[in-house]
Each structure stands twice: as C-alpha cells, then as structure tokens.
Design a protein with these regions (language model features):
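Double-stranded beta-helix
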Residues: 73, 142, 163-204
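Glycine- and acidic-residue-biased ligand/ion/polar-headgroup-sensing regions
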Residues: 117-136
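A short glycine-rich, Lys/Arg-flanked "PGG" loop and its adjoining helix->strand segment in the class I
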Residues: 383-398
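Short, glycine-/aromatic-enriched active-site segment of Class I SAM-dependent methyltransferases
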Residues: 401-424, 428-430
Length: 451
C-alpha cells in the first residue's frame, strides 16, 4: 500500500522543489492521490518499481517543452516530386467546413484581428508573408514574428491577435472550421484588433531576414522572442523623442546550425556613430595586451616586417599593444567615423569604412595577422566580409576572430547579450560550417573570458 506521503518522499528525492497539494475532491483529477479509495478498488498494480517509475517520469517531464505555441508553421508531409512537379500532403486533425481562396499583393496587410473561439489554418500555395501575433489574454505577452513560405500551413490559436504582412504576391487557402458570417468581422468568428500599422509594415519589409546569412537556407526556426525593442546604443537626444522598435528574436537554421536575429537593422543606423569605446574597459585593455604578447610569440611575428590588420577596430584597443611593442605596420578598419577619428588621433592608423569588396582596393594586402573581435556578431554581410579578410591575408597568414560563445549564452542565460547589434550567435559547429564554405579551415579554438 502506497500513501500520498510515500509518493511525495520519492518525488522529492528526484526533485526537491516538488510540493504536495491537498484536495477534498472525491473524484480523481490531475492531482489525484494513489491512496484514493476509488482507485484502489480498481485493483491498480505497479508493474515496475515505483521509485524507478517516478524517477523516469520526472526525468521525461523535465525535458518536455512547456512553451505555449500561439501560432505555428508546418511544411507538407510525404512529399513527392518528379518532372511534372511536386505533391505535398497536409494532415488536418479537425473538420473543415469552409475554404476561402485569397489573393494578396506584395506590400499589403491582412488580418489585424483575432478569433475568440475558433482555430484558423492558412495554407500558402504561392508567395510569402511575415506573421505578427500576440496573446491577447496575457498582458505581458510580447509581439512575435515569423515567416510563412510557399508550401507551408500556418495555424493560429484562439484569442491570438495576428496580422499578415505580404512580402510577395501571395495566394493562400483559409481553412475554416465552424460558422463564418458574410461580413468579415462577427462575434462568432473574427474580432477586429489592429496592432500593426503601415509604418511597422514598412519597417519589417525593409529589415526582415528571410534566409540564413551563413548557408542561405530558408528553414529558420524561432527559438527566442524578446518582443519589440529599441536599438541598444541609440540614445535619445530629447526626452520626448521616440525610438523605432524592432523585433528582437533569435532564429535557428536547421541546415547549418547558425543562430541569427530575425531582422537585420541597417548597419549605418547602428555603427556610423558608435557610442561604445572598448578602451574604457580595463578588462578589454588587459585582454588585448595579453593577446598581443601571445600572438607575437606563437605566430613568430616581427615588429619590423609583420603586417597586422584589425577589422572592427573600434578606438584601436587591440592594436595599441602592438604599437607599444614597436610594430610599425598596423591598420585598423572601423566603420564608425567618431571611433576611427579617435584612433587616428592616437596614432593608430585606421581606415574609416566597412570591409567590403568596394573598399578592398583601398586597403593594403598581404597581412600576416588579421584580427576580428566580435565582428562576426556585428556583420550582416558575413560572407563578403570573410572573403575580403581572406583576400587581404598573405599565403601564410592567420585570421583570429573572437565571438560570443552560444553555449555559454545558453548555459548562463545571458540573454542581455541578445540585441540588434549582434546579428549572429555562434557555436563552434556553425563557425566550422561557415568557413568550410569559403575553403578556409579552423585549426584551433579556445575559450576566453572577456565579458
């Protein structure tokens, strides 16, 4: 015979935070006790040791995703393609009694409503949209976005406000379960709820990232949403000024394991007059002094002959230790005009501009060492920048990059490292894939503690 107290002790053994809830209900429910008379009369028997069974249940439950999906997207199943075209199959788990065929032109907006009772499904046969949705029953729910592509079905839960921004000419089927009156808005089907205007539509269409910047795949899955946020370092000049708000969401590429933001805000808007100067941090200054001494020793660099470039050089913090070691041939590349001016004032030669193919001809080549600290998080045009770095390198040269490590972000829950300047979030796996595409090889990796 097993009592509730017995079960509680076993549960607490594997999960010390568990609590027991006492009820007076005679009918078994979600918190029924194993000593309940009605259950015992049914002759319930444990086929396995209770201790092991509870341990297994707690272990499995701990790994279950408890996130509430307000709206989700799926592709077709059991697809078949030949020279005639492609067949995709979609399973509908509930009856459909009406189908609407809808065409929408690029740049238009639909929905801006919610369904109080019914679940809505939309099957997209052509085009592409950005969906924006929000749980209206939860006052703290963030506004979330996702992309729906041709050949995918989107399911919208009841009481979820949603809007469609059409990024291409689009055709879709609206699969309706239940009653739908002739007028679009009615108590039994749809209630108007405008929460996306034309300004937000234009903002999304101008900066949304539809494909992986590492491999080009469109199979991106949203893994984190922090709602709409202002740009972190663009401070207001006046108290009553208003900031533009952008989605702050991380998408995961199922093809190459790259993680990136759902939007790519124009780099000139964020970096042309950058406020953060790296030299203000003693941790960074000390780190780059130690790094310079290490690189000189390991790579056998010569203060007279070696040529060193720092991409995204900020105020010259990583090059100053080389200057102090009497290296004559150093160059910073910095897009922020205020920082480039500051570095040049401090006698650290700095080119003001982005590292692009257009600017490549203005920069001396054959570098023995190219540094890039956190630049691979700050660049939307990753491949172009990386190709330029390889082009600037001497045949025996080395590129050393520093990036925030995704595994540490997950382990330490440092979500404050997620902001719009950081377009990308790297693991070693995704970095190896990225450089392999460029026929470059990562031959060494190590952790450094600079944050």
């Amino acid at each position: 015979k097993v009592t509730v107290k017995d079960v509680e002790k076993i549960c607490k053994k594997y999960n010390p935070k568990i609590i027991i809830k006492e009820i007076n209900d005679e009918v078994p429910n979600l918190v029924f006790s194993l000593s309940h008379k009605k259950l015992m009369k049914k002759g319930i028997k444990f086929l396995y040791a209770l201790d092991e069974s509870i341990q297994e249940m707690i272990s499995k439950w701990s790994k279950q995703d408890l996130a509430k999906e307000l709206e989700f997207v799926k592709g077709g199943m059991n697809e078949y393609a030949d020279n005639r075209g492609k067949i995709s199959n979609f399973e509908l788990t509930e009856p459909i009694n009406m189908i609407g065929l809808i065409d929408s032109k690029k740049g238009t907006i639909r929905a801006n409503h919610y369904h109080p009772q019914q679940e809505q499904k939309c099957l997209f046969t052509k085009g592409q949209i950005i969906e924006i949705f929000q749980d209206i029953l939860n006052p703290n729910s963030p506004k979330i976005t996702q992309v729906v592509n041709e050949g995918e079905i989107s399911t919208i839960k009841p009481n979820v406000a949603h809007t469609m921004v059409f990024t291409k000419d689009t055709t879709f089927l609206n699969l309706v379960r239940g009653e739908r009156e002739h007028e679009n808005y009615g108590v039994t089907h749809t209630i108007k709820h405008v929460f996306v205007d034309e300004k937000e539509r234009d903002l999304l269409m101008n900066c949304y990232k539809f494909d992986c910047r590492s491999c080009g795949s469109t199979k991106l899955k949203r893994v984190v949403s922090l709602g709409y946020q202002p740009l972190a370092n663009n401070l207001l000049n006046k108290k009553n000024d208003k900031n533009d708000l952008y989605p702050l969401e991380v998408n995961y590429c199922e093809n190459c394991h790259n993680c990136q933001l759902s939007v790519a805000v124009d780099a000139k808007k964020m970096f042309s007059n950058y406020l953060y100067t790296s030299s203000t941090s003693k941790v960074f200054r000390d780190h780059f002094v130690n790094a310079a001494n290490k690189y000189v020793k390991e790579l056998k660099l010569s203060s007279k002959k070696s040529y060193i470039i720092d991409v995204g050089s900020n105020d010259g913090v990583a090059l100053k230790p080389f200057k102090d070691l009497n290296f004559k041939n150093i160059l910073g590349i910095e897009p922020a005009s205020n920082l480039a001016k500051l570095a040049n004032k401090n006698k650290i030669k700095t080119f003001n501009g982005f590292l692009t193919k257009k600017n490549l001809k203005k920069i001396k080549k054959k570098a023995d060492l190219i540094l890039a600290s956190n630049v691979f998080a700050h660049s939307d045009n990753l491949k172009e920048m990386a190709e330029c770095m390889i082009n600037l390198l001497s045949p025996k040269g080395t590129i050393i990059i520093e990036v925030q490590y995704l595994m540490n972000t997950l382990k330490d829950l440092t979500f404050d490292n997620i902001y719009h300047e950081h377009y990308n979030y790297w693991s070693l796996t995704s970095l190896i894939y990225f450089f392999n595409q460029l026929e470059a090889k990562i031959f060494k990796a190590e952790k450094v503690d600079t944050h």
